[in-house]
Structure formats: C-alpha cells, structure tokens
Regions:
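Glycosyltransferase donor-sugar binding loop
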Residues: 230-249, 267
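N-terminal pre-catalytic "stem/leader" segment of glycosyltransferase-like enzymes
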Residues: 1-98
Length: 396
C-alpha cells in the first residue's frame, strides 16, 4: 500500500464519531502509514443530530457528498493509483456509487483497492433502518457495494454469519469495533475505586425501540425492591431525552419524579461529562436488541465500570465468554441476580473474575487489525468455514 485515503464520519458530540478520526490517525502515525484524510463540509457547526437517531440524515448526506467531491478531484488529478487504498468508515456513505463508475472506465493503474466497515444495516433485523422502512432500497445499495469492494470489515464473528446468509460474496474480515483507549483516558482518568463510587447503574444507549427502554425501566423498578439506594441512570447527550417513541420518554420522566424506582435522567452531557459519570458509576447495563459490540462497553470498561450485557449475538465474544458479564436475555430475574452478584463483588473488593480493562484493550487494537487486514489479508472469514471461529475467545 502506497497511500491510504481515509473516508471518515462527520463529528457528533453525542456519538463516538466525535473522536473516531483522531483514534484512527493516532494508529496510522504509530504504524508509519502514509495517509490522507478526505474531509467533507458540514451543514452547520452544531454537531447535533436533528433528523434521525443514529446520525443526522441531512448532515450525513451533505458531508458524504462533499467528501466524494474532494476524492473525485484527486482521482481526476491522477493522485490516486492502483497501489493505494480507499477506506470507508461506514458502508453507507451517500454518493459511493460514483467509485465503480469511474474506476471501470479508468486505466488499471488508477484503480485503487477499496475497503469499508459494515456496522449493521439490512442484515440486522433490529437495525433502525428496518423500523424506518428503508430495507428494500438499502439492500440493493449493499448488493451494489458488494460487487466492487475488495473487502468488508466487521466487528464480530457473529456478524459474519449475518452477511454470508444475506448473500455477500466479498472477503469479510473480523477486526473488532474501532476504539482509542489512550485518547479516552487523556480526557478522564478514573481514580475512584468501585466500592467508593456512587451506587449507580448507567444506561448509555439510544433511548429507542431497538435498545429496549422498557426492559431497563422494568429492571429499575424491580431492583428498587432489592436495594432502593441503587440509582438507575440514563446518560444522554441531547439537551432533552430523545426517543423514536414518546412513551419511553414519558415513562422515564415519570420514574424520575415518582417513588417506584431510584431513577435519574442525565441530559446535555458532553463527552467528558459522560466519562466522568462512568468514572463514578459501578455498572453499565445494556439490553439492546440491536448492538454489535458497542463502544459503550469499551468506554465503561476503560472507566473501571463493571459491564452487564445480554448473552446475545456478539456479546459472548465481546466478553471472551465470561458469564459474569452476561444475563439470560430477556430475563429481569437473571439480570437482578447478576447485579446482586456484582454488588457483592464490589463491596468485598473481589473483582478479578471481571477482567476489568481487558475488554477495552481488545477493542483498542481494532484499528491496527484493520490495517493488517488491508495489508496482509489477516482474519479473513471464508464462505464455508466462518462459524468455526465463533466460540474462540479473543483474549484471556
């Protein structure tokens, strides 16, 4: 690889994309990669998600199209060659169809390799685009992309199967989910031992259908009968709690105001505010139907929190099959039992079995593994034997 052209995502305060480019650039520099970031234009400087829930629908499209304008100019100038690689941080990058259109009509020496990261989309039945009615056209888009890219990066072994049974043909590589642990620790360094922290369980996912808000609120009410001092919190980057269904917001605010749960909604959190809350919390909880690895688990682990997630889809892999981090989906009773066990371990300062720090260490290696896949084809999963890797622990 002569040069890497990096097609990143626009920055949002409430999303991991705020830091994603810096995480990548740090590893590129460490590895001695000759790279160029292809930037786009932003609609405004709010760094806010207004239309949609994952990324802003207008902002995402505007940024991506302007990114492509800049890359097209470089290709027109002959600055991008067959010895180069273009890497897209997200498969859905509006305007991507121009790439095969130009390359198929260009001399072979001006056809770079193209790799991208596939995060979810139509192969996940619980992805937001399914509930928004985007399946039919998005699947056709994905099939188009699968015709011309050189490789697809995914976060977990479990997701490989979803792509293969959907008919994807191109090489698939398992890398983990990109994360920059050192950058996060530079923002906030946890100093308070777990047993001295606020008795708090946090929830850091979107407050939307696919994250099952009602399950979390059911748990909060049930655990109030076990330990009324344990706070159940929502960590939200928006100025007000936002959801695709108002009923989730209404119930959360009612719980906060009522006396059936110790419930608190934190809103308007900047990234460092969120990290400081994690650094003073004991547990991060997840009950998502749709989550492939999740940056929240890496962030919580970095901040010294215990993490309790469902034994579902990619999470056994995320935790290297450590049952202490997982509960039976979707059992409130089992989640309560696991929380009680965590509380006992915290109170007695016996935490070795939770492997704190190792979870985020593995994801911290994702960007390096992505480079290795592009350079050497490492961690490729074939068409017939991809399931043999599923039960193997990624770390010890």
């Amino acid at each position: 690889m002569r040069k890497l052209f990096y097609m990143g995502l626009e920055s949002y305060e409430a999303r991991y994309t705020l830091q994603l480019q810096e995480w990548n650039e740090r590893v590129f520099k460490l590895r001695g990669i000759d790279y160029e970031v292809i930037n786009g234009l932003e609609l405004d400087d709010s760094k806010a998600i207004v239309t949609g829930s994952v990324l802003d629908a207008h902002g995402r499209t505007y940024y991506s199209l302007s990114q492509h304008m800049n890359l097209i100019q470089k290709m027109k100038n002959g600055e991008v060659t067959s010895d180069d690689v273009i890497f897209y941080e997200d498969m859905f990058t509006p305007g991507l169809e121009w790439l095969p259109y130009i390359m198929d009509q260009s001399p072979a020496e001006y056809r770079p390799k193209v790799f991208l990261r596939f995060l979810a989309q139509t192969t996940d039945p619980d992805d937001f685009l399914i509930r928004e009615g985007m399946f039919d056209w998005m699947r056709k888009y994905e099939e188009m992309v699968d015709q011309f890219v050189d490789g697809i990066m995914v976060a977990s072994e479990e997701f490989v199967a979803h792509l293969r049974i959907a008919g994807f043909k191109k090489p698939i590589y398992v890398t983990g989910l990109p994360y920059g642990k050192s950058e996060v620790l530079e923002r906030v360094t946890p100093t308070v031992a777990l047993h001295n922290r606020t008795k708090r369980v946090g929830f850091a996912s979107r407050w939307d259908d696919e994250k099952q808000p009602h399950f979390y609120m059911d748990l909060a009410e049930a655990y109030y009968k076990v330990d009324p001092e344990m706070e159940f919190a929502i960590f939200c980057g928006h100025p007000e709690l936002k959801s695709n269904r108002q009923e989730y917001v209404d119930r959360a605010l009612a719980l906060q105001a009522g006396n059936t749960a110790n419930f608190k909604v934190y809103t308007g959190l900047k990234k460092n505010d969120y990290y400081n809350l994690l650094a003073d919390s004991q547990v991060l909880f997840n009950c998502a139907l749709q989550d492939w690895v999740s940056n929240t688990v890496s962030e919580a682990d970095t901040m010294g929190c215990l993490t309790l997630f469902p034994a579902y889809r990619s999470f056994p892999e995320v935790f290297a099959n450590n049952a202490n981090h997982m509960y039976v989906p979707w059992s409130v009773e089992d989640a309560i039992d696991k929380l009680k066990k965590m509380q006992f371990a915290i109170d007695n300062v016996y935490l070795d079995e939770y492997n704190i720090g190792k979870i985020s260490d593995y994801q911290d290696g994702t960007i390096g593994r992505t480079i290795d896949c592009m350079l050497n084809g490492e961690d490729s999963r074939g068409h017939t034997d991809y399931r043999k890797y599923v039960a193997k622990a990624k770390y010890e």
